[in-house]
């Protein structure tokens, strides 16, 4: 048998070799797998570095762009390009940005950036509103280690939203706590706390509401706890679905007292249920910062200026094209009206027309003052021509000694200071042309007359003075009854009126019984106090108020009645043209003053019949209708050349009497000792209380309690009114701070004399439907558009119907249309159609003498308010608040039983610096109206916004993506 054992030799070696081969192969496989994974991991790591480098670069670019638009509203392409320069490119370890890898793409239109108007998309705080949209594409390519690259793009919008797209906005705390139902409409936003309460009726928030701080339901801003004694605890409805309140009750829900974002007032514990309430229950229709609300800022606010810079006069040296300068209405205006105590105050103001000097209103003793005022440092004179009763001269005081007519100063002008009026040219924006002479030559007084009739065409745009109020003739007196007459045994009632260039005065009734038949009655009356009397009318009747026949007599002061039947039928005048005078005598005119009890009375206490100096406000009155004519060129010559930018803007800054004691103008009242919460009657306490610090800087200012006037004081004043300081006067009693609010004057003194404190204001009149500029739009010309904005550094009063009318309400009429309108001032007060300066002065603390009538206003309003403070021991439950949204529009009349109809947008950017009188109701300052308030939905269209509407800015991200590069 053959054996094969030797044939098996070497098999083991083969097996070993095969195993070795397999193991080697496996090891090679493991090696390649391991090294491959390492390479993949390294590549992934490098790509991750590049990826996060690209993301970081994109976030840096987005942040820089957002920060840029915080302080720039109209950037140039070069400014955008600069944001991609080397100083902006981030420095990241292991990452570089190749050339062309850090860019912002945009579309140009001419020399600027292309923008569109439209609805804002995305999820930012301005989403859903109409705005100016400027699109950008942000692109970042980041190179990482080992030639890795990642490219990221983001599409964003820079959006600018006009503030009047909001129904109500406040930069500080915002309070709702009306008694009757209140449903204004439009979006609601505040950069502070949102206090929501209602006292009897229902408050409806029928659009989105946001508070950057907290939503507070538990108390008012003065700390009053809602629900105490059953007050301020009724329904606050907030919508839960678009189109909800009040259209669908099911789509809104009452926000309970316990459902604020905090459990109490500001700074209290967070409500643990708030996020669910805000985001889920109310579907985001009410938010605070915790649930997505953002702060809304004007560009100038985050550029370092306070929002009140909008209305402040530009300081010397400021660039009009800077962020702050371009936001000021001083620079935006078509027409600006500036008044100061000295010519030096105008020197070097930005953009000023230095070729013309300011016009003097207070040159005591100027040659020929009755017809002209000399300019102090130029070769010529300004003439207020034509000189006549329809175009009177500058008011001059006849003096206390001249006729004992309640005048303080002798032989000095009553207006004071200098005025400069300039027009910005439409052909070359930024260039200003002096038009002072042209404007003043149209007239400076209102309600003047020629002969016995009002002037047919009084074209005055500015009313700086008015005819001296016509006194009421005194009552008959010194009655004597004698026999041998023709009068029967009866009682006769008599009224005597004075005749003269003013027409016919009012009279005062008196009566006398004959005491028997066949009698005659002799009586006297006081001589009328004005010069120019041509005679008297004597009215007689047999019942009080029934004087129905009269006789006319000459310039005498006695009469004997011995006639059974008087020859002429007629009734006693019940009203007189109290501000009419047919005269060219400067002493027959007085300043335009009113009394504001909110400013003058520190507490809501009735009784005093005298005025306080703080409440007498001197007005620059603007006849809106005549201004419309001037812009259209139907009066004057220059108006059509004025800057037209979606309409016209008029700016006013009156700083006469504004002096901080170091000859500096501040634009602020400067008296911060008027609230004194711990003092029941409000007497100054000599310290700065928190709500008095309107600047928020902790500095106690009292210079506003002292008058600074520029005459030499060598004139005769009523005893004790002024001290003898040669350059500044201190009202006796104001020298001691504890007497500042007790110094008083009579109604006639307040009406006829210049203000002695810095109390200047603007009043708009004759602004009914169809009277606002531009003329073509207001008269309903087909295709015409444009609006009208008035901005002032001072408080503004609107008298009578404005951009609407009693006859038509908020509707337009044939040939009379509303225009987009805004009124922007330190504070805004609405005066009714029935308002009268004389009644106002005569009834400083008596509402019965200041009765309002139903009036209509259609305009956006921006104004200041006052700081809230803890509820004091005096006053009402809401004392210490700012009055709430329902009292943001100020009143100084008895509106009881009347309706105040308002349509517009309510905006508060700042704390008032001049109208510092606190909210108080309802004994002295006003009685509330029935409020017909609502948001003007026209403002939801950018084309229907007033010129110069301030805007919020934001950068809104729309999309984000990563591009796949070939190198990846």
Descriptions of predicted regions:
Residues 151-161:
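A short, surface-exposed beta-strand/turn
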Residues 144-151, 502-508:
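Short, exposed coil/turn segments at beta-strand boundaries within extracellular/luminal domains
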Residues 470-580:
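Disordered, low-complexity "stalk" and linker segments at domain junctions of extracellular
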Residues 2-7, 14-53:
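Aliphatic-rich helix starts adjacent to a transmembrane/signal segment
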Residues 39-71, 190:
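Membrane-proximal N-terminal amphipathic helix
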Residues 70-135, 144, 162-165, 169-469, ...:
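C-terminal globular interaction/adhesion domains in large, modular proteins
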